[in-house]
């Protein structure tokens, strides 16, 4: 079953609107790009790989995308849109404290990636070999999340105690951990690193005992440890 469930057209002649046909073909190409990258490195994926999986012609591919990179970027943009929607939904509660929002955000992020292993690999591993435009999209997403984490400085009695740059460093480190799990083919187990990531993100902004306590409660909720 396709991870993004691209619509399939009926075989043979049909009277479907042209817009519907193009949308279906485009969705299938995006899914095929992700699936191909899951099996090969981006540099090794060819247009032939993509169209054969999508069951569309090479000419159809070039009617929709000018090249392989454009298809890759479109797939990334599509999955990032869904990721951001899930993240916003998870944190959209005015009663949540900042640490609670961070925990909700981490859990939503890791569950999303675990459920979309092909796209997780494409967006977090293959971005680095897909050219400057792809890398800029990746860095933009990291900066977006870092800006959210930087809200923790408002919790500090003196905001200048924690430099603004810390958020970017923490999120960059978290991304390395996530990338390593994906490369080691542990994508479906990503939620298990959530408690450790929570501690790493919270500890620059609060007492380390409180950060550890929140991390341990998170682990208990996931069933990773049992309460004494």
Regions found by a protein language model. Give the residues of each.
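Alpha-helical DNA-contacting segments of helix-turn-helix folds
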Residues: 21-24, 28, 36-37, 65, ...
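Secondary-structure edge/capping motif, primarily at the C-terminal ends of alpha-helices
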Residues: 87-94, 123-127, 178-185
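Hydrophobic alpha-helical connector segments
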Residues: 88-118
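Helix-turn-helix
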Residues: 36-70
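Short, amphipathic alpha-helix enriched in basic
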Residues: 20-49, 228
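C-terminal peripheral helix-coil segments that are non-catalytic and often amphipathic
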Residues: 1-13, 111, 115, 147, ...
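Short, structured motif recognition centered on aromatic/hydrophobic residues
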Residues: 42, 83, 99, 121-123, ...
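Amphipathic alpha-helical packing segments from all-alpha helical-bundle domains
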Residues: 132-155, 164-176, 191-199
């Amino acid at each position: 079953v396709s991870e993004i469930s691209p619509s399939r057209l009926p075989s043979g002649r049909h009277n479907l609107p042209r817009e519907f046909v193009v949308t279906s073909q485009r969705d299938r190409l995006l899914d095929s790009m992700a699936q191909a990258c899951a099996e090969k490195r981006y540099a090794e994926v060819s247009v032939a790989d993509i169209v054969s999986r999508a069951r569309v012609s090479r000419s159809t591919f070039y009617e929709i995308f000018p090249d392989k990179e454009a298809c890759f970027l479109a797939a990334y943009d599509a999955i990032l849109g869904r990721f951001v929607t899930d993240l916003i939904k998870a944190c959209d509660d005015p009663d949540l404290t900042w640490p609670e929002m961070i925990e909700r955000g981490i859990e939503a992020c890791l569950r999303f990636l675990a459920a979309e292993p092909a796209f997780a690999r494409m967006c977090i591993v293959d971005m680095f070999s897909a050219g400057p435009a792809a890398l800029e999209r990746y860095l933009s997403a990291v900066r977006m999340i870092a800006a959210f984490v930087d809200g923790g400085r408002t919790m500090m009695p003196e905001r200048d105690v924690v430099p603004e740059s810390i958020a970017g460093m923490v999120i960059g480190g978290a991304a390395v951990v996530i990338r390593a799990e994906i490369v080691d083919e542990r994508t479906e187990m990503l939620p298990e690193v959530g408690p450790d990531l929570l501690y790493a993100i919270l500890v620059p902004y609060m007492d380390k005992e409180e950060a550890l306590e929140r991390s341990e409660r998170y682990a208990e909720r996931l069933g990773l440890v049992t309460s004494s």
